[in-house]
């Protein structure tokens, strides 16, 4: 008998419902989705709305409203719950509020007997991923945050627009905090087989333009929040990408919130931060210790130290 894959979503807000919709319309891998939210009517409404579209799907998926007991046999628990970033707020402003929320959620999930993989998308995601690891006492490879996957997607979109190529031909990452202290790996970036440094040498693009592109990446969330109140479609797709990579054992390299403990020159320890890692059915197979330039390593340390300064204030 084929194994039936089950995902539980905690959080039926904009991000959670966008992920649920993305998972539903591309549901070849997941057989059951349970949605949990403290706002029970909202979660029930999302379940009803999704179920009413079953006739239009290639394959039906069982979608239900539930509670933490439903996590006991889940393969993956996705957490998108928590307070959202408001106009003028940084993601780090949410640390204290969302840590309290996460303690209750993670305790509830683990008490069910859940032994699968956590995927965290709530902000500040790097810190909330660390918080989940601490409160769950799970091994680090079974706790994953969305990290800089969305930032990287934004970067590749902007570069693809600039060079008039498909995003699949852009090989570049945003690393560090999912937030203002992130950095682009310009020194390692390639457009197809050609390095970005070659394009700069040819005069095709200038470094000042690259600075502007990175600023667009960093400010993208603020722009979307200003225009429509919140970001959720793109990150919903990003969560689905991570979930699919786990369910189908893809060994896919993604810049998730990875647990760093001595990689990248042994300067960064005991922290979750955006860095490329291999995602598989066990969660994280390996955090890739890429050789990055000295100037990028310095940015990585600055970003890590900023996150660490917030983590050190949390009492576990």
Swiss-Prot record:
Pfam families: Ldh_1_C (PF02866), Ldh_1_N (PF00056). Its main location: cytoplasm. Pathway: Fermentation; pyruvate fermentation to lactate; (S)-lactate from pyruvate: step 1/1. The keyword Oxidoreductase applies. Its EC number is 1.1.1.27. Keywords: Allosteric enzyme, Cytoplasm, NAD, Oxidoreductase, Phosphoprotein. InterPro entries: L-lactate/malate_DH, L-lactate_DH, L-lactate_DH_AS, Lactate/malate_DH_C, Lactate/malate_DH_N, Lactate_DH/Glyco_Ohase_4_C, NAD(P)-bd_dom_sf. Belongs to the LDH/MDH superfamily. LDH family. It comes from Borrelia hermsii (strain HS1 / DAH). It is found in: Cytoplasm. Substrate binds at residues 85, 91, 123-126, 151-154, 231. It is an enzyme of class 1 (oxidoreductase). Gene3D superfamilies: Lactate dehydrogenase/glycoside hydrolase, family 4, C-terminal, NAD(P)-binding Rossmann-like Domain. One of its GO terms (cellular component) is cytoplasm. The active site is at residue 178. This is L-lactate dehydrogenase. Catalyzes the conversion of lactate to pyruvate. Allosterically activated by fructose 1,6-bisphosphate (FBP). Homotetramer. HAMAP family: Lactate_dehydrog (MF_00488). NAD(+) binds at residues 15, 37, 42, 68, 82-83, 121-123, 146. One of its GO terms (molecular function) is L-lactate dehydrogenase activity.
């Amino acid at each position: 008998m084929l194994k039936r894959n089950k995902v539980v979503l905690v959080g039926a807000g904009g991000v959670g419902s966008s992920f649920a919709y993305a998972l539903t319309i591309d549901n070849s891998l997941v057989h059951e989705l349970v949605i949990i939210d403290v706002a029970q009517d909202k979660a029930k409404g999302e379940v009803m709305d999704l179920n009413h579209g079953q006739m239009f799907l290639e394959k039906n998926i069982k979608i239900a409203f539930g509670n933490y007991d439903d996590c006991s046999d889940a393969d993956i628990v996705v957490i998108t719950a928590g307070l959202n970033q408001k106009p003028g707020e940084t993601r780090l402003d949410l640390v204290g509020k969302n840590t309290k929320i996460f303690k209750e959620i993670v305790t509830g999930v683990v008490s069910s007997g859940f032994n699968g993989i956590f995927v965290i998308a709530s902000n500040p995601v790097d810190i909330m991923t660390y918080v989940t690891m601490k409160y769950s006492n799970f091994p680090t490879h079974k706790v994953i945050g969305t990290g800089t996957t969305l930032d990287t997607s934004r970067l590749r979109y902007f570069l693809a627009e600039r060079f008039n190529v498909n995003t699949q031909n852009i090989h570049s990452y945003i690393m560090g905090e999912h937030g203002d202290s992130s950095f682009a790996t310009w020194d390692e970036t390639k457009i197809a087989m050609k390095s970005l440094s070659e394009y700069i040498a040819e005069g095709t693009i200038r470094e000042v333009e690259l600075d502007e592109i990175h600023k667009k990446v960093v400010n993208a969330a603020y722009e979307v929040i200003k225009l429509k109140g919140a970001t959720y479609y793109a990150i919903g797709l990003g969560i689905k990408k991570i979930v699919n990579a786990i369910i189908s054992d893809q060994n896919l390299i993604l810049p998730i919130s990875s647990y760093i403990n001595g990689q990248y020159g042994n300067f960064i320890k005991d922290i979750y931060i955006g860095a490329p890692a291999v995602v598989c059915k066990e969660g994280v197979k390996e955090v890739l210790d890429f050789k990055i330039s000295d100037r990028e390593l310095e940015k990585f340390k600055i970003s890590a130290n900023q996150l660490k300064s917030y983590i050190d204030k949390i009492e576990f």
